[in-house]
Each structure stands twice: as C-alpha cells, then as structure tokens.
Amino acid sequence: MIYEICTQTDPGLTRDNNEDAVAFDAATRLCILADGMGGYNAGEIASGMAAAFIKSEMGRWLSQAGRHANAKEVRRAMEICVENANHSIFNAANSNPQYAGMGT
C-alpha cells in the first residue's frame, strides 16, 4: 500500500507566526500534529519539541512492540510519550527565560 501524506497549517487571522508542528514517520505510519498555544510565549518551540519527541519515542515503541500490541497498550504508550514530551517542554520553559509559559 502506498501512502501520500500532505500537511498544511495556518496561523489564522489573529497571529503573525504559525505555532503548529507536524511530524510523520513513514516506517511506523505515525503522524503527529501539535498545536502551539497562541498568545503565549514560544508556542512554535513547544509544538516543535512535542512533535519531534513523540515521533522519536512513539516511533521507536511502535517499531519494537507495536505490531503485537493491543489497543490498550498502544493507548498507554501514547499517554506516556505525551507525558514525557510535556515534562521536556516544561523543563525547557523553566530553564530558558525566553521560553517561559510556552506550551502546546
């Protein structure tokens, strides 16, 4: 089966910069969309971090265990990846004043 993936994001009418991020892992057919928190600091950084982190971690998990996993195991792996991405973003925001308050 051949997949064709197209993505497009739009900052909308209120914001000048686009704070959304999209990532795709062809090997695992994993697609991630992270929506930066508009109106807050560095939303584009947070969404980029989240998309990259989840692509890496969930992609690795799917490559190793995903073929034999049931829906409950996949859901739990997704929850863990999102929680870990959130911790990473929170730590970056606390370590860098220019990222204070960022989120996705």
Range-by-range predicted roles:
Residues M1-T104:
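PP2C/PPM-type serine/threonine phosphatase catalytic domain
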